[in-house]
């Protein structure tokens, strides 16, 4: 890829600007992911963003904001609802390889892409499910989920299916543009925290809302 070294340095500096610690190993994985994403995006609609630097900030770094806003349990099981091109799940896994990840994606071609990324990056303890959250919830339990991350989907549309997936006191991490309203949270959950953070390079604000299962 043209300007690859510049993009590596840009990735490291942008992630570090969040308050995380990224090095060459992380940059290598993000670059391989970036190149693979751009190539597959030529035939599958994975993202409308085509500029590499914008992908780095608006997808990779944006996905990592949750690591600053809240704590993820060591070796915790995290379900990415509507993973699409792998956001936020795969960037989270790159920075937190201890996490056990479930990527739920209903579009078969996108699920194929996710499986190819898992193989390319040699990611361990990552599985995919070709279906919706509703369909996943109806399956025999595969994992006890500690956290559900929701970035691409509307939380209100999948809210009723989430409680059955979560362990007691399990959490949902919502990537939002603005604050959540009390009536949007639902009777099965309560608000734990809500933090607004600015993305690096002046790319705007991201709100991370964390809600917890009541029992």
Where are the regions that the model predicts?
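Class I SAM-dependent transferase core
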Residues: 1-75, 79, 116-126
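Conserved SAM-binding loop of SAM-dependent methyltransferases across substrates and taxa
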Residues: 85-98, 160-162
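Conserved glycine-centered beta->alpha loop in an early N-terminal alpha/beta scaffold
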Residues: 82
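Conserved SAM/SAH-binding loop-helix junction
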Residues: 65, 87, 91, 109-112, ...
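Residue-level preference for alpha-helix termini and adjacent loops
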Residues: 45-48, 54, 86, 144, ...
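S-adenosylmethionine
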Residues: 98-100, 106-215
